[in-house]
């Protein structure tokens, strides 16, 4: 009966802006388990995939390599660069990359009343598969704790925090779209991500 009550309360928290059942799936590890099953690889050259998450926005502003995506956002400057390659290590040119992240207070632009997009952008890799952009250092942030999932975390002694990260979606002709995240290596929540 307690389990039925918990699931009922979880369902009652769901609406067009909040999906408590998805949050429950995330915190129980089911979401990532399904993603891992659907994107199995033993190749160390292949980046680990993840789910899209609730803060992706299609068609972000396009920027050139090396430009800033931190329009009107305060925070510690952070330079991101990398190289996209295939499983043989060959560089991939013209890969379309969407990036998005939280600000230094742990909020995404869609959670604030901003007039335009911020801390999200689209760009393409160069002939050597390279990309680069300036942003601000993202911050860890808590998932919602005002519902049944928050109570579950509390009674099981788990914190509600996600480690600081930047989301990436990479799209290239002839390849499966990759959604992944890059985490700050020294984040205190890196080994205990709430989701």
Located regions from the model:
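Beta-strand-dominated extracellular/periplasmic modules and repeats
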Residues: 1-195
């Amino acid at each position: 009966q307690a389990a039925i009550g918990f699931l009922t309360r979880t369902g009652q928290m769901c609406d067009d802006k909040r999906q408590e059942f998805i949050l429950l799936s995330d915190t129980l590890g089911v979401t990532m388990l399904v993603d891992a099953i659907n994107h199995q690889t033993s190749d160390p050259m292949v980046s680990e995939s993840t789910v899209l998450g609730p803060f992706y926005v299609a068609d972000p502003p396009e920027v050139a390599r090396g430009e800033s995506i931190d329009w009107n956002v305060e925070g510690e400057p952070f330079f991101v660069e990398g190289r996209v390659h295939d499983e043989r290590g060959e560089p991939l040119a013209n890969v379309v990359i969407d990036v998005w992240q939280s600000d230094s207070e742990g909020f995404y632009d869609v959670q604030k009343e901003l007039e335009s997009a911020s801390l999200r952008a689209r760009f393409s890799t160069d002939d050597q598969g390279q990309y680069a952009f300036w942003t601000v250092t993202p911050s860890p942030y808590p998932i919602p704790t005002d519902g049944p999932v928050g109570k579950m975390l509390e009674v099981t002694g788990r914190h509600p925090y996600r480690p600081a990260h930047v989301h990436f979606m990479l799209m290239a002709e002839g390849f499966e779209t990759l959604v992944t995240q890059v985490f700050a290596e020294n984040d205190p929540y890196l080994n205990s991500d709430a989701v």
